[in-house]
């Protein structure tokens, strides 16, 4: 089991060139860089110049590109550095298996499932930013973490908030958790207005700086829907214990309600480096140069119930949790296909949820996964079914 408490932490970052990966490296450098952290492996996809620069800067032992065709390019970029180079699935597996007590799982999508599962099974502490591990693989992934004996440290700001305020010796007294949602750029728009919004308009998140896909997921609240499913597995909750509240300021990141009526919340300025820093230094707290919350300047905190007519993704997540089986994988696979069609202008914003619901109807009753092959098969079925509904 990884202790996670050593003075110099040895780590691997799966997905170092993405948003979470680059933020993780930023936090590492702010906390002392190579004096305090030893980088076993970094993995990326197509941004070879950035991956090579990161590997050189951090003195990584191994650099991996998930794109097998780019092996030569990465090899040339790291020529003379002494850094090992690998590529493709084999390379990702090698990075996951490399001896490191702490692993940031930040590869986006199903590509992150295999290496993250492998790292969990060998007992690494997993800082989890990949949604599919819990949404699609659910109990399979939780079982792998238990089998390995490492710790699971959520990096999503909402789940990280719950993790921080959840008293381990009082879990039996948890009545509910409350995930906060900003409401996104369309919080006050009517149904008719939402049907005609564009992908570029969905990108304008009021509080967080994110990529196009995650911004659209946030605008449709599909991101929050996935977080509901993740929370169920992370904290071993019933579906009826998970609530969502719209909080436009994104200052209260989430809350835990206890049986005695107490509600504990974690607050902070919206900055992913806070959650990353907490996961990176756990169980200690580190000194991070992030913006401090000024309550006098903040003045007010607003909360409102989500409108599940305009944002049906929340209802679909609840259904997926209640039905169980592989419905999480089905929801996610269908959503990914519908999202791609929306970005391409082939379907409207509200059509995405309708497509997902139809696919969930068609594929209802798939049994719980017993292997990753089951998860991938359900995902592929959902994507194909969704594609068949798109003009």
Curated annotation (Swiss-Prot):
Keywords tagged on the record: Isoprene biosynthesis, Manganese, Metal-binding, NADP, Oxidoreductase
Amino-acid positions noted as binding 1-deoxy-D-xylulose 5-phosphate in the UniProt annotation, renumbered to this chain: 131, 157-158, 182, 205, 218, 223-224, 227
EC number annotated for this UniProt entry: 1.1.1.267
Keyword NADP: yes
Entry GO MF terms: 1-deoxy-D-xylulose-5-phosphate reductoisomerase activity; manganese ion binding; NADPH binding
Names of the cofactor(s): Mg(2+); Mn(2+)
Entry annotated with the keyword Membrane: no
Pfam families attached to this UniProt entry: DXP_redisom_C (PF08436), DXP_reductoisom (PF02670), DXPR_C (PF13288)
Binding site for NADPH: 17-20, 47, 130, 132, 211
Pathway: Isoprenoid biosynthesis; isopentenyl diphosphate biosynthesis via DXP pathway; isopentenyl diphosphate from 1-deoxy-D-xylulose 5-phosphate: step 1/6
Binding site for Mn(2+): 156, 158, 227
Reaction(s) this enzyme catalyzes, per UniProt: 2-C-methyl-D-erythritol 4-phosphate + NADP(+) = 1-deoxy-D-xylulose 5-phosphate + NADPH + H(+)
Top-rank lineage group of the source organism: Bacteria
Leading EC class: oxidoreductase
Biological process, per Gene Ontology: isopentenyl diphosphate biosynthetic process, methylerythritol 4-phosphate pathway involved in terpenoid biosynthetic process
HAMAP family linked: DXP_reductoisom (MF_00183)
Protein family membership: Belongs to the DXR family.
Name under which the protein is recorded: 1-deoxy-D-xylulose 5-phosphate reductoisomerase
Gene source species: Sinorhizobium medicae (strain WSM419) (Ensifer medicae)
Gene behind the chain: dxr
């Amino acid at each position: 089991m990884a202790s996670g408490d050593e003075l110099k932490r040895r780590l691997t970052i799966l997905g170092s060139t993405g948003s979470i990966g680059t933020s993780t490296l930023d936090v590492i450098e702010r906390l002392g860089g190579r004096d305090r952290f030893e980088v076993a492996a970094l993995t990326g996809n197509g941004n070879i110049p950035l991956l090579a620069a990161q590997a050189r800067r951090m003195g990584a032992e191994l650099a991996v590109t998930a794109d097998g065709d780019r092996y030569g390019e990465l090899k040339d970029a790291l020529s003379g550095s002494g850094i090992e180079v690998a590529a493709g699935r084999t390379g990702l597996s090698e990075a996951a298996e490399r001896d490191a007590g702490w692993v940031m799982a930040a590869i986006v999508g199903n590509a992150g499932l295999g290496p993250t599962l492998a790292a969990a099974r060998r007992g690494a502490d997993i800082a989890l930013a990949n949604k599919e591990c819990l949404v699609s693989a659910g109990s399979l992934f939780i079982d792998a973490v238990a089998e390995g004996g490492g710790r699971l440290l959520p990096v999503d700001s909402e789940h990280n908030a719950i993790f921080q305020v959840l008293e381990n010796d009082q879990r039996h007294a948890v009545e509910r958790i409350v995930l906060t949602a900003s409401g996104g750029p369309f919080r006050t728009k009517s149904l008719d207005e939402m049907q005609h919004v564009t992908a570029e308009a969905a990108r304008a998140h009021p509080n967080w700086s994110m990529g196009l896909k995650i911004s659209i997921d946030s605008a449709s609240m599909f991101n929050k829907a996935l977080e509901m499913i993740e929370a169920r597995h992370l904290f071993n909750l019933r579906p009826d214990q998970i609530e969502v509240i719209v909080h436009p300021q994104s200052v209260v990141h989430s809350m835990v309600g206890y049986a005695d009526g107490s509600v504990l919340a974690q607050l902070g300025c919206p900055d992913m480096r806070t959650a990353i820093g907490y996961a990176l230094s756990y169980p200690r707290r580190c000194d991070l140069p992030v913006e401090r919350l000024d309550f006098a300047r903040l003045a007010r905190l607003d909360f409102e119930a989500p409108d599940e007519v305009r944002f049906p993704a929340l209802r679909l997540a609840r259904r997926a949790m209640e039905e169980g089986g592989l419905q999480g994988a089905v929801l996610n696979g269908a959503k990914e296909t519908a999202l791609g069609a929306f970005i391409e202008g082939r379907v409207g914003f509200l059509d995405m949820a309708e497509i997902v619901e139809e696919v969930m109807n068609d594929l209802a009753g798939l049994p719980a996964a017993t292997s990753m092959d089951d998860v991938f098969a359900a995902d592929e079925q959902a994507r194909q079914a969704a594609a068949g509904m798109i003009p």
